[in-house]
Structures are given as C-alpha cells and as structure tokens.
Amino acid sequence: MFDVQREELMWGDRKLVLETGKVARQADGAVIATYGETSVLATVVAAKEPKPGIDFMPLTVNYQERAYAAGRIPGGYFKREGRPSEKETLVSRLIDRPIRPLFIEGWRNDTQVVVTVLTHDLENDPDIVAMVAASAALTLSGVPFMGPIGGARVGYINGGYRLNPLVTETKEESSLDLVVAGTQDAVLMVESEAKELSEDVMLGAVMFGHKHFQPVIEAIIRLAEKAAKEPRDFKAPENADVEKAVLEVCEAELRAAYTKTVKQERYAAVDAVKAKVMAALCPEGAEKFPAEKVKAAFKEAQSKVVRWNILDSGARIDGRDVKTVRSILSEVGVLPRAHGSALFTRGETQALVVATLGTGEDEQFIDALEGTYKERFLLHYNFPPYSVGETGRMGSPGRREIGHGKLAWRAIRPVLPPAHEFPYTIRVVSEITESNGSSSMASVCGGSLSLMDAGVPLRRPVAGIAMGLILEGERFAVLSDILGDEDHLGDMDFKVAGTDEGVTSLQMDIKIAGITEEIMKIALAQAKDGRAHILAEMAKALTAARPELGEYAPRIETMQIPTDKIRDVIGTGGKVIREIVEKTGAKINIEDTGVVKIASADGKAIKAAYNWIRSIVAEPEVGVIYDGTIVKCMEFGAFVNFFGAKDGLVHISELAAQRVAKVQDVVKEGDKVKVKFLGQDDRGKIRLSMKVVDQQTGEDITDKIKAQRDAERAERGDEPREPREGGRHRGERRREAGE
C-alpha cells in the first residue's frame, strides 16, 4: 500500500530521519522529518493554474504546533488550538524567507506550505526540523523550486560554536541563538539574538551553520532522486523585448524621477512615468504588450535605474553616498504622563516609542509546547497605514508587525537588567508615525531611549541600522541606512543592532547567490561604523538611564520572607493579604521562593504594606516592649495582640506589681496596653508581662521593682533575691525543686 522512502543521517550528535510516501499522499509533496524525538510533517500543494491579475508569487507558509505533540491538552474553554501564536507566526516567516527567492521568476500559481509539529521531545526545537521538512517537501513536489535549502541553529558556548544546541542549552548556557538557512552555494537567511558579540563571532557562526547543514541538503537530494514527482511544465516568461521597450520609453524620465529626494514627490514622479509607459505600450484597444508584462517590466526598469546610478556614480536615491546615515533627531520625555517616551526620527522614518512599567501581575503568560511560562519584557510594533501616506486595514497585528516587533525585542533584551535587580514587567510600544525604510531599527533606537527615560537601568544603549547591497557581476556597493526603495530593489537586506560593545541582534535576507563571506564581512564592518554614529546621535538626548523612575511609574519594594511564613501572610482563603491590599492600596505578589514584591505609585502605601508583612513574619525579641491590645480576658490572665497578628498571654501574676484577684479589675477587652516579651514556654506559647512596664511611659521598670523589693526585704531583715516571674515557669520551678 505504501511506497515509503527514507533517508537517515547523524547530524550533530542526533539522528535526522526524512520519510515520505506514507502520510498525506494526495499532497504534491509530503515529508515527515524527525530529529531526536521531535517530528514534523510538512506538506506542499500548488494550484494547477496561475492566479490571474497578480504580479507577485502567491506563497503561503503555515507552521502550526499541536498540543498533543508535547502530551498536553490546550487550555481555554474550547480545549482546542486557536489562532496562531506569536511563535507559530515567527516560524512561518522563518521558513518563508529562505524559500521564497528560490521559486522561478514568474511563478504565479497559489502555493501553500503547511508544517505541523507532531511530537516534541522538549529538547530539539521544532523550528529547524520544520524548515528542513518544508525544504524536502518542496523538492519532492515538482513545483519550480530551485532548492533544496538547509537550516541550522548555532549556539556559542564557552567560546565555541555548537550545532543545534538543546532547548535548555540555548536558554541557559549559550550567548548566541542564531538560525541560518541557505543552499549548497549561498546563505539566504539569518535570524539571531546575541549577548553583545563581535562581528567576527557573528559571521563565524553564519559560516559554521552553512557548513554544517550541507549534509542535510545532500540527504534531501538523495531522497528526491528516489521519490520526487515530475517537475511542472513551467518556464520563466521571456520579457526581454518588453523590458527593452519600457526602457526606451521611460529611462531618462525615470532617472530624473529618482533624483527627487523627498519620498512623496519621488513617488508622484515615478507614478507619472508609469502612466506614460502604460499609455505608450498599452493604449486601450491597441496593446503592444499585455498590461501585466508591462507592469512587471516597469518594476524591473525601476530596479535597473536605481542600481545603475549607485554602481556608476555612488549616488543614492536621496543624494547620499553609500556610507552616510540620514539625519537623526532624538527626543525623550515627549509624553507627559508616560513612564518613559522617545521620538526617534531618521530622515523620513519616525517612531514614537513608549515604555511602561508594571508589576508581576502584568507579566504575559505564554502557553507553549514546553509548558506555560511568564514573560516580563514585551515589545509591540505598530505600523499604521498613515505612516506611508496611505489608507488601509486597521486591526490586529499582521505577520510583518509581529516579526519586526520580535526583531526589536531580540535587540534590546540582552541589555535589560535581570529580574532580581529590577523586578518590573516592561512593555515597549513602537508607533511608526513615518516610514521610509528601517522602521524596525528605529524601534530599537527609540525603544532604548524610552527605557532609559523611564529609568530602566540598561547595561548600555542599543542602536540598530538597516543595510543593503547592490551586486552586479564583480561590482558591488554596500549601502548604510537603506530607504524603502533600496530595500525592495537591492540584493541583500540585513539589519544589525547592538551596543558599543557588540552585536545583540542580526537579521539577514539575501535574494541572490554570489554574496561571499568577504562581502558580508565588509557589510558588517560598515554596519558597525553606522551603529557607532547612531549611538553618538542618540547620546545627544540621553546617555544612560535616569537615576529615578518616572513620576507615574509604580515603585516596587522587594523583601524576602521565610517560605514557612507564606501561608501566614496569605491567610486562610487569602484573607490576610486581601486586607493588606485593601487597606494600603499596594499590589502584592508572593513567589514560592518567599520573594515578596510590593508595588504602588505611592511610597507611603509601599511602606505601610512592607511594615505590615514584616510584622507578620518577624519574630518578637525577648526583653523588648511592644504596644498591644487586650483581645480576651480569662480567669488565669489576658490575651494580648501585640505584634502584628501575634497574640500572647499576660498571666494574672504579670498584670500588676500587686496581687490581682480578678483579671477584669486591671484590664478589659479592647484596652491598649504595653507589654514586655518574656519568651515562650515549653509548649511554644508566648509569655508577656505588663507589671514590669510603666503603662504611661512604656519604660521597663524591672530594676525599679527589684530595688523596691530588695528594700522591703532589707527592712524585714530578709536576704535579697531575684524577682520571681509568674505563670507557667513559676510552677515549673516549684516542680523542679520538689524533684
């Protein structure tokens, strides 16, 4: 029934298995990839006919995690998976980015890649396995895909690179989390987070990963030789004649349009040239070429004009040379009641970034295959249509917004203070108010400034820069701080963020082969210079975190209590902690380790809650006098609440210096008294005394009582002796004497 084909190899120190022919046989391509005990199913289906009226490649990648893969049942009311999580969206993009450039130009058939995590061993992250499985399924499917690709994760542990480190190693030991993908000849995609590593270490990791995923590519090729379907009958459309005709009509005017340095004016001029081309080559009723081909050829003409200008003269669209960064203006404290805010403007790209501080209650709960955990640092990126002068959809964030936000998150997270030093939940929101390239890097710069404005003690300021590359044969130009057009028309887009000490994040997308290690090295060095310039410009606004938190930010006081006292602070059914919160107005979070975080914008509320909790967990000191309240009178004495929630007994013999016949003759319930803590009896009960304390002044009069008794004994001719203590201990001494 099944024609199963398999390929196995040892990759790193674990086995990778690729299998096809048993599951999802009606798909154009289907592969189950297993690494360790993490298994992923990837399927590919492409429409039989091209989609009419489009000028882009209609590729969709859907990565989905199933709770059963980790032996879990989803939470929520419906107990089933819902909308894609942030990680699912990010991994979908991670797979899409290296495979999209490898489809033959002109492919317009709807193509869907669906990747499903079937099992997760909690050791091997499914994202790399998913990328390999998707590459294999595409290679088998017969669609015009010029792959396969391979992918790998690279860690940096104790000064050495580690291939596909385990999940725990990546989180706890590695100073680098880098994912690289590419073909046999070229690197196509890099995504990474690093702890201020050098450019040389980052580039070394890229090349290390490229070298070590070659066996995977070879295994996919061997599998394809046994199980691949016949290639689709598709050839890239020949547009040379159309492109030539378009250039003849518009080259001079297009070059002139691209000399306009203001984005809106340039776009208007380019649109006018396009309208002229369409009128000349596609007049109504007498089309010389199909309109779709003319539009595609015009885009190609735009690319050629921009690229020729840069390579021939070094002049860019806005008049800069290849290394110059656009003018920068940084402002902080721009919003009066925000905890921290910054407005970062770089040319025609602008980000209004706001930092907000919260407590442990504000941490985000992440429901992942590895289990539920809490995230204390959030960064959200919003890209409204008005930022590019357009109307458009408003609503929940799209894949691009999620991806850009995560890139900025990776750039800033390595310099945040640890939770035990700064116990706040931190949220940064970047509102892109203007955009003409590298808005994600503007979010990094603005995010760093807003956090410092809020008083968050970052290790060092972080800046980011977007770089581009134009490559024609042996000639190339590396572009610093690219515009939107340079991003679309160039051959490489890579973003580097970091401090003056090193790189914290690197994202790279390469659209063509032929980009060598040496070119990437030059590009990274140029990016380092650009980053240093941006950091210097940011320093004009703020060089380090403010010494105090923002006026409206909550203050958090941390205290450690014994774990066996946690239940005393919480109380039965939460009674005690609710009372503290209600009466002080502070927020209180108690961790299992005994760490208590008290938060409020009012310092008095924090102090009141702190003292209340301390009174509950602290132990009274022997010999110290405390204020108390009579809570109950008995025949043998009175119970006094004297130390927070603590009660102790004043024995009838300790109520007053003279003999007391009836407790109520001295005190009644509700009386405010002063008591001395005498210690605990053999049953752990607290013993208190009132008679040795002056109830008016609170003075300890033990010595006065002793002196008075000694004087009385002297008058009687008796030997002086120590004053006796009443209660249980007096009886114990009598019993001991009897023994």
UniProtKB/Swiss-Prot annotation:
Its main location: cytoplasm. Residues 623-691 form the S1 motif domain. Its cofactor is Mg(2+). Its EC number is 2.7.7.8. SUPFAM superfamilies: Eukaryotic type KH-domain (KH-domain type I) (SSF54791), Nucleic acid-binding proteins (SSF50249), Ribonuclease PH domain 2-like (SSF55666), Ribosomal protein S5 domain 2-like (SSF54211). It is found in: Cytoplasm. GO terms for cellular component: cytosol. It holds the Pfam family KH_1. It catalyses: RNA(n+1) + phosphate = RNA(n) + a ribonucleoside 5'-diphosphate. Residues 694-739 are annotated as: Disordered. InterPro entries: ExoRNase_PH_dom1, ExoRNase_PH_dom2, ExoRNase_PH_dom2_sf, KH_dom, KH_dom_type_1, KH_dom_type_1_sf, NA-bd_OB-fold, PNPase. Keywords: Cytoplasm, Magnesium, Metal-binding, Nucleotidyltransferase, RNA-binding, Transferase. GO terms for molecular function: 3'-5'-RNA exonuclease activity; magnesium ion binding; polyribonucleotide nucleotidyltransferase activity; RNA binding. Residues 554-613 form the KH domain. GO terms for biological process: mRNA catabolic process; RNA processing. Residues 701-739 have a biased composition (Basic and acidic residues). Mg(2+) binds at residues 487, 493. Involved in mRNA degradation. Catalyzes the phosphorolysis of single-stranded polyribonucleotides processively in the 3'- to 5'-direction. Belongs to the polyribonucleotide nucleotidyltransferase family. NCBIfam families: polynuc_phos, PRK11824.1. This is Polyribonucleotide nucleotidyltransferase. It comes from Methylobacterium radiotolerans (strain ATCC 27329 / DSM 1819 / JCM 2831 / NBRC 15690 / NCIMB 10815 / 0-1).
